[in-house]
Amino acid sequence: MSHSSAPERATGAVITDWRPEDPAFWQQRGQRIASRNLWISVPCLLLAFCVWMLFSAVAVNLPKVGFNFTTDQLFMLTALPSVSGALLRVPYSFMVPIFGGRRWTAFSTGILIIPCVWLGFAVQDTSTPYSVFIIISLLCGFAGANFASSMANISFFFPKQKQGGALGLNGGLGNMGVSVMQLVAPLVVSLSIFAVFGSQGVKQPDGTELYLANASWIWVPFLAIFTIAAWFGMNDLATSKASIKEQLPVLKRGHLWIMSLLYLATFGSFIGFSAGFAMLSKTQFPDVQILQYAFFGPFIGALARSAGGALSDRLGGTRVTLVNFILMAIFSGLLFLTLPTDGQGGSFMAFFAVFLALFLTAGLGSGSTFQMISVIFRKLTMDRVKAEGGSDERAMREAATDTAAALGFISAIGAIGGFFIPKAFGSSLALTGSPVGAMKVFLIFYIACVVITWAVYGRHSKK
């Protein structure tokens, strides 16, 4: 029988009977199974974000270990993982319904060991060409793609009224990997903890040694552990199975492209600022030891993402998103007042404080826009199936599939911000010697998002 205990075991068995919208089923079985899958998914996604943003901590240190790359080249290394991550999120978003959440989570976590090991060896050899670092940075992008499949997978496990909180937790705590990496990397690069594997330090002017390989090697054992945990502890849902053909129609929805734009402004800002903040700070305030502070912004943004999902469940995603974009525009304007002019003036503490506010709102908006996506696409699909005379069971199944596909595809668009923001900073600095040009573009974009959110979802919320 489908209600046997076999599918419930934490052995990765396929669950054939899954009805999270049924209150009795949810209380008796569903909540326990969903929670277990969520809390294994979270550390897997957290580690993926650590790997995805590795170059945000490594690039700023490459000159210290003997590499002579230009500032624009270093910005490019921080930006490229977001390019491959964004492109790969599209196919990754379709993988869970094809292969199952357990199998795909284990596979996608395990393969991240490859760029981590390779980068550790590359940074120890100053003859390593720039092209090799480009390849490794693109491979780190596989980690960024994990977000699409992870969020799609978790969306299948939870009922509609709990999806905002669940997706907020998974995404928010997963996003925490950026700050965890930026906190841990500066600590471990000062320690000879992998000498047995060939890790060699480089003498610094202050007499200390920099073991840059540790910044990537430190994640390898944890990736191995949670690959095993995903394989044996998570479940595949038979009800989530769907071919790519069944998932593609969601791309025809106009709301998909509107929400992609809004998510680009929120999550794209979060991941873009995470990738480029350390390098930008180093160019504007060269005397500041920025890696001592860099982790604070992503940490606050990740916490805010969890809050954004839960807050949207209570107040409505549109309302939270609209207010959030207004705040992002205000903080972007304030940032101009904190920068030095011709190398003179400026206040790092004011710059840092405003950027923390931007990280906060980018994280909050990431959670609120994701909640909007879940609500919008579930309702659109259920209304369509009901209008066609379909059953409630079919409506719920197709709604879950469409929502997961939309979440994955929109997350791919959002990840592009991780490329554009650091690349925009690098290009603006190369052309004008200042990041102001890039910041003006961001400000205009946030104002446009205020107008779009109000025009499409604010005035016509009932529609």
From Swiss-Prot:
Provide the transmembrane region boundaries: 38-59, 74-95, 103-122, 131-151, 167-189, 212-233, 254-281, 290-312, 317-338, 348-373, 406-427, 436-458
How changing residue 367 to A affects the protein? Abolishes nitrate uptake activity
Entry keyword annotation includes Transport: yes
What does the record give under GO molecular function? Answer: nitrate transmembrane transporter activity; nitrite transmembrane transporter activity; solute:inorganic anion antiporter activity
Record annotation: effect of changing residue 267 to A: Decreases nitrate uptake activity
| Sequence positions that bind nitrate | 89, 175, 263, 411
- Please name the SUPFAM superfamilies in this protein's record: MFS general substrate transporter
Q: Mutating residue 89 to K leads to what result?
A: Decreases nitrate uptake activity
Which positions does UniProt annotate for nitrite binding? 89, 263
**Result of changing residue 268 to A:** Abolishes nitrate uptake activity
One Pfam family recorded for the sequence: MFS_1
Q: Which UniProt keywords apply?
A: Cell inner membrane, Cell membrane, Membrane, Nitrate assimilation, Transmembrane, Transmembrane helix, Transport
Q: Which residues lie on this side of the membrane: Periplasmic?
A: 60-73, 123-130, 190-211, 282-289, 339-347, 428-435
Catalytic activity of the protein = nitrate(in) + nitrite(out) = nitrate(out) + nitrite(in)
Gene3D superfamilies per the UniProt record, alphabetical: MFS general substrate transporter like domains
Record comment regarding domains = Each molecule contains 12 transmembrane helices, forming the N bundle (TM1-6) and the C bundle (TM7-12). These N and C bundles are connected with a linker loop between TM6 and TM7. The substrate-binding pocket is located at the interface between the N and C bundles. Substrate recognition is coupled to the transport cycle by the concomitant movement of the transmembrane helices and the key tyrosine and arginine residues in the substrate-binding site.
Q: Please report which protein family the annotation says this sequence is part of.
A: Belongs to the major facilitator superfamily. Nitrate/nitrite porter (TC 2.A.1.8) family.
This chain's protein is named Nitrate/nitrite antiporter NarK
According to its UniProt entry, this protein's organism is Escherichia coli (strain K12)
